[in-house]
Regions:
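Active-site Asp-x-Gly
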Residues: 66-117
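Residue-level recognition of alpha-helical structural elements
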Residues: 29, 116-118, 140-144
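An alpha-helical support segment within catalytic cores of ATP-dependent transferases
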Residues: 1-57, 147, 151
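A general structural signal for well-ordered alpha-helical segments in protein cores
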Residues: 16-19, 101, 129
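ATP/Mg2+ or Mg2+-diphosphate-binding catalytic cores
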Residues: 24, 133-157
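Conserved catalytic-loop position in the HRD/HxD motif
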Residues: 58, 63
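Alpha-helical elements of Rossmann-like donor-binding domains used by nucleotide-donor carbohydrate transfer enzymes
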Residues: 35-39, 90, 103, 107, ...
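Hydrophobic alpha-helical segments that form the core
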Residues: 121-130
């Protein structure tokens, strides 16, 4: 499987480095986004790469396809080997209220330990930053600001 996806292992530190390298200067000067970024940098999950799995890497509604009452995850261009909490963070951070994460994870078949919830939260925050940059780069300022507001409402900081 690693050969099929190019063997791309992505650690949280690598993800933050890539984010920082492509961060537009206007967003670099945003004190709120800087605060979230520094939180992420100071709280990088300590999860062994030996436990990494193949993850989709872009689990959002733009990549969902419903057909005959089945939900399909499409557009596997962002596939990588990473912490499985990456996809969960993207999904839960944007679509499930934090107060429902434990219940959702139990339904998913996962025991919501403090360690797992911390990792999922980290990736949820990271995904918000990624989406904010995406909206900025595509000139979607209204959507970018709405994403910042959702980040503040969901996680504070």
């Amino acid at each position: 499987m690693l050969e099929k996806i190019g063997g791309q292992i992505q650690t949280p530190a690598m993800m933050l480095d890539a984010y920082e390298a492509r961060l537009p200067s206007e967003l670099q000067n945003n004190t709120y986004l800087s605060r979230v970024y520094h939180y992420l940098r100071e709280n990088i999950p300590n999860y062994s790469v030996l436990n990494y799995m193949v993850v989709h890497g872009d689990v959002n509604h733009r990549n969902w396809l419903v057909s005959n009452n089945y939900l399909y995850l499409v557009d596997w261009d962002s596939v990588m080997v990473a912490d499985p909490a990456l996809d969960l963070g993207m999904l839960l951070g944007h679509y499930v209220p934090r107060s429902s994460w434990n219940k959702w994870l139990l339904s998913y078949g996962m025991r919501p330990s403090d360690e797992a919830l911390t990792r999922i939260k980290w990736y949820a925050l990271y995904n918000f930053l990624q989406e904010i940059v995406r909206h900025y780069q595509t000139g979607e300022k209204r959507e970018m600001n709405a994403e910042i507001l959702r980040l503040k409402q969901a996680f504070g900081y």
